[in-house]
Each structure stands twice: as C-alpha cells, then as structure tokens.
C-alpha cells in the first residue's frame, strides 16, 4: 500500500514538474530569473516528497515505512556497540547556611578557605602598614631615640 502511494505521489510530482517547466517565454506571467527549470522541478519534487511523510512513505507512522518496516533487512543493524548510560554522579551539596554560624561568619570562613586554596591574599596584605602597626613591630634592641 505504501509503495503504491509513493509511486502515485512520484508520478504526480513528475507531471507537475513538467507542467511548470514547460512555460514559454511568451506567457503573460513574469519570469523569475532566480529559478530556472531545475529550480521549479526541485521545488515541486521537494513538496511532493515532503507530503509523502518523512523517510518512510505513507505508512511510516504505522510501522510500515522504510525506517520502521519489518521487511527491510538493511535498516536492522545489530546493536552490539550499545553502551549503558553512566551511573549518576553523586552531587556534593554545598551548605549555603549553617545554623551554627551566621551568614557573615560563613562568608568570612569561605573567603579564608578560598584564599588558602588559590594562594590569593586579602587586600590588607597589599596595603601599606599604618603607624600603629609600625610601632608594634619589635626591633632588634631598644629604640635609640627614646633610650
């Protein structure tokens, strides 16, 4: 049944293609310069094949087409290389908020951990030392100015 339908659609598409392709230049309709005889034939054949369902003729949806048909042995390839999908990966859920710590403490801890892992330093590391920090630094001996 599907082959008869496909043959009928093919014959109709060829007849329509020949009808469109045999237009004379003296006809009243304007000529489209972008498509010649092959453009017209290709357009009609494409429409006719698209109407005859995808890849398998009229019976493709019922299982009788070229893709799903039981009588075509060339489409039935052995599936020896089939692999099962990988097992699902265990996702480590990150705790965004722990009840023991406040969000500010958690953020501070996260920043310290991030700096430790990546080797980055805080912004204070790059700042100049203040006068109080310089006074706190113990020298090698007594301060010669005051002693």
Curated annotation (Swiss-Prot):
Disordered: annotated segments:
57-86, 116-147
Record's keyword terms, sorted: Apoplast, Differentiation, Glycoprotein, Host cytoplasm, Secreted, Signal
What GO terms fall under cellular component here?
A: extracellular region; host cell cytoplasm; host extracellular space
UniProt protein name: CLAVATA3/ESR (CLE)-related protein 4C
Report residue spans for region: Required for secretion from the host cytoplasm to the host apoplasm: 21-83
Functional summary from the UniProt entry = Mimics host plant CLE extracellular signal peptides that regulate cell fate. May play a role in the differentiation or division of feeding cells (syncytia) induced in plant roots during infection.
Basic and acidic residues: compositionally biased ranges = 125-137
Q: Which residues form the signal peptide?
A: 1-21
What are the annotated glycosylation sites?
A: 32
Where on this chain is CLE (motif)?
136-147
Source species, please?
A: Globodera rostochiensis
The keyword Signal appears for this protein: yes
Q: Which family does it belong to?
A: Belongs to the CLV3/ESR signal peptide family.
Compartments in which it is found: Secreted; Host cytoplasm; Host extracellular space; Secreted, Extracellular space, Apoplast
